[in-house]
Amino acid sequence: MRNQVDATVELAREAEAAGLRSAWFGQTFGADSPQLAAIVGREVPGLQVGTSAIPVFGRHPLLVSSQAQTAQAATHGRYHLGLALGTKLLTEGGFGLPFERPIARLREFLTALRQLTRDGTADFRGELLTAVTPVPARVPGAEAGVPLLVAAMGAQSLRVSGELADGILPYLAGPRALETHIVPALTAAAESAGRPAPRIVALVHGVVTDDVAAVREKATGHLAFYEQIPSYARVIEQSGGRRASDVAVIGDEKTVAAEVRRYRDAGATEVVFAGTEIAGEADRRRTWALLGDLAG
């Protein structure tokens, strides 16, 4: 099996050459996404890099701040940190932690993390988390701070994100869900808190292909896991879908370009594609070529 870091850097170079502007890295139980983003950002200076997204359970703000500031210094200001609530299944099954009060934990995590990444110090004592720096926690080179985004789609997480974060990273949320539910709730929360207009980085599962039926059937299997998670099931329904694959963007160049425009019109400030390898290398490259043209 090929070295994952080497393969990722190679793909990132290809993405830059295709005209893409950013590369985002998920976090599971394998590679450390902030480290991966830092390496890619150093090796491929034309790309913005980000993490989408680190669960707030099983992590501590002090450690995540160290990772994020190091990645920001390594990339000279091109790193973006995404956080997520995570799921009950992975939190309790993987970390052995009770999945309790996730919204309160997100609020405390963001509050402490903002202090750390902005000021290089923290003196936060909440109900669930404590983050205190007896010595400075600033990483030279990361003085500008780190953009904080949240994989938020529900009403409560959108409220917290609007108040405390710089934006959101909704996944499997189609244009209808963005326009009618997500964007209004997030924008209202940000305005009430006196915050700037938030970024809405729509994460879209999609690919350019001529074999639409077969690829959508394959996507149905790949994405079925998300249908078991209440927050995803809800946003899929809000998007007008029954299955997660109903929200996937699959079709020829004209179809995919039109869907990207729909996301933009619905309020997405950035559109990021995932799963572009599902139909093979030729269609992945075809997808990247289109997205590079749209980005240009």
What are these regions (language model features)?
Residues M1-G296:
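Active-site-adjacent structural elements that line small-molecule/cofactor binding pockets in enzymes
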